[in-house]
Amino acid sequence: MKMMDGLRSIALLATTLFALPAIAADVLVENAFLPGAEGAKGEPVTILISEGRIQAIGAEVTANDVERFDAGGAIVTPGYIDSGTSVGLAEVSGLGTSRDGRVEEVRNAAGFNVWTALNEGSSLIPFAPTDGVTRGVITPSADEANFAGESALVRFVKGDKFLARASLAQHLYLREWNRRGAGGSRGNALQVVLEDLDEAARFLRDQRQYNSNKARPFSLSTRELRALGRVIKGERLLVVHVDRAADIRKVVSSFERFEDVKLIIAGGVEAWRLAPMLAEQSIPVLLNVLDNVPESFDRLGARLDSATILDKAGVPIAFMSTTPYSEFRSLTQAAGVAVANGLRWDRALRALTEGPAEIWGIEGGRLAEGEVADLVFWDGDPIEIMLSLIHI
């Protein structure tokens, strides 16, 4: 079957996936629309794609000797980015033998990297692109160790290379239930974390002595020291999973002495209380807007409009699903909940696309010349969960 016949067939099936970046030939996407106000159709747009990148975009773009793709009047957006999920690391939440996302019974797991355990054949992965999620940050979870290890960036679109970046960020857990390994006190947990970072800093300073076995002994393994060294040098982001405002404030102030550490707050149920401080220091917050119930003493300040407060203050935000056991559509559902509670529609879309791309320091997330052609086509409002994705 010729390529054009294949495209026409795809246009008839809302559940069929079409990976534009995987096409070697130049493609001209016609009859598409940019998102307008509140999810309505905006300006008509034609997009020229070559070698998986947007070469030109606008109302007057034309090209010869290209394959043509009729978007059928659909709204086009960049693919969504899930800023925190464990898909590919587990299949069944209650079955321990299917979970590979955490290291148990160790004091420090900073050297663990989830990409070594990722299963690109997971039964859960095909659900991601059907909800417009084309990339995801796969995060480790914590057992007794507060430092849980490094996350990885993956692509969910069939035909693309699955692993996009093997080592993206280090993850540190300091929530109410993450204090067992520190004797039951979150205060001691933070002190131990700072001591580990100090030890990693000494490891970086004493490399020559260490290599010649002349350095004072370290309590951490070489793998953990190197992983934390990457954080100290700013080579890896540090994602701190924490909810209580008092804890967030202590984390921010405690890490100020590590000048190159790049902090991100994940969860941040009470981060809205510190919005001016976080905005001033340009510390991003990764939110699960649906996680808004005050189910613990860490979350007494939970509220539905936290994304609105943070965004209005100028805090960079992005949305995450946090678990693979619910539909990826929870990302768009979260965006819709945020809009219903005051977040501007365009800012909600940004928190799924350009926002996370900037926070994670990865390309894409924008419809612009030179960007990766990571395109998703919708038959209506891109954050309305009752509408369908047409193509990806």
Please provide the spans of the model-predicted regions.
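Histidine-rich, glycine-flanked metal-binding segment
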Residues: 34, 38-77
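Conserved small/polar residues in nucleotide/adenosyl-binding loops
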Residues: 390-392
